A protein has these predicted regions:
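Transmembrane helical segments that form the transport core of multi-pass membrane transport proteins
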Residues: 113, 117-186
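Alpha-helical membrane segments and immediately flanking helix-loop junctions
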Residues: 1-53, 156-171, 179-204, 213-216
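C-terminal transmembrane helix pair
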Residues: 42, 46, 72-76, 176-257
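Intrinsically disordered, low-complexity non-transmembrane regions of multi-pass membrane transporters
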Residues: 87-118, 247, 251-258
Length: 258
């Protein structure tokens, strides 16, 4: 919930903290990292929708439900797929809980307000620093002297830093293609978000490469769902969701059988 409500990278930070405190097993940490980092609803409602509304030559206004469905529905199939990949289920959680319960008192016996406050300051400085660094890199890409395909430069900007990238996509890519690039960028989180996530994982033993692969998959599914919701019917959108669900369960079934 912290990753969903607070945005990048709070889901990863909460997962890392709980893992360090022994409140989660390693399998739970890997599973939660795959599904807990997302743009917050406030960012989507206040910024993403505002930028989509500014896109020139949009044939029709982009409905809010299509954006929310594209960004948050992929969590369901990715959740099932992550359970399969990391062999996470209720039984393994129950087996890990006694060990976590024994380790937790040793790590959380002493509460220090100063330590927690400094941890918050450190996280804010890291997040702000990476946002500034990658925003500067995005500005360099806008004045890059070499010729690029028309959509490559905006796509690169969105993949570097989502706040700056989304704004530049909205001003340079007309029509529904601009909205599609914005959705893909918001779902991916940008390399700025990846570096922010890496900075808060600390020594939790979680793989940033796995996280990148999950975000790429999430971005692809978000683009697919948004495209279907804009150009297909509601029945087609439900069909795509049902297909993803069946595929995820098909991947999960051999593990359950074993």
């Amino acid at each position: 919930m912290s990753g969903l409500l607070c945005g990048y990278p709070m889901g990863a930070k909460t997962t890392s903290d709980f893992l360090d405190q022994g409140r989660l097993s390693v399998q739970e940490g890997k599973y939660l990292l795959a599904i807990s980092n997302h743009p917050s609803p406030m960012f989507v409602l206040g910024y993403v929708m505002a930028q989509i509304a500014l896109i020139p030559s949009m044939a029709s206004p982009c409905p809010l439900w299509a954006v929310l469905a594209a960004l948050y529905l992929p969590i369901l199939p990715i959740s099932i797929l992550a359970r399969c990949c990391y062999h996470y289920n209720r039984q393994t959680r129950e087996e890990a809980c006694p060990l976590a319960a024994q380790a937790a008192p040793e790590k959380t016996a002493c509460f220090s307000f100063d330590t927690h406050m400094m941890s918050c300051f450190e996280t804010m400085v890291k997040i702000g620093g990476y946002i500034m660094l990658f925003s500067i890199l995005a500005l360099y890409l806008t004045v890059f002297p070499f010729q690029m395909p028309p959509l490559l430069r905006p796509a690169l900007l969105g993949s570097v830093e989502i706040t700056t990238g989304i704004q530049m996509i909205a001003s340079s890519v007309p029509g529904s293609m601009g909205a599609l690039l914005i959705i893909g960028s918001a779902a991916f989180g940008g390399f700025s978000g990846i570096f922010q996530t890496k900075s808060v994982l600390k020594n939790a033993g979680l793989s940033i490469r796995h996280y990148m692969l999950w975000k790429i998959l999430h971005s692809a599914l978000s683009c697919l769902i948004f495209y279907v919701s804009r150009y297909g019917s509601l029945c087609l959108l439900l069909g795509v969701i049902h297909l993803l669900r069946r595929l995820a369960f098909a991947l999960l079934r051999p593990h359950n059988a074993s």
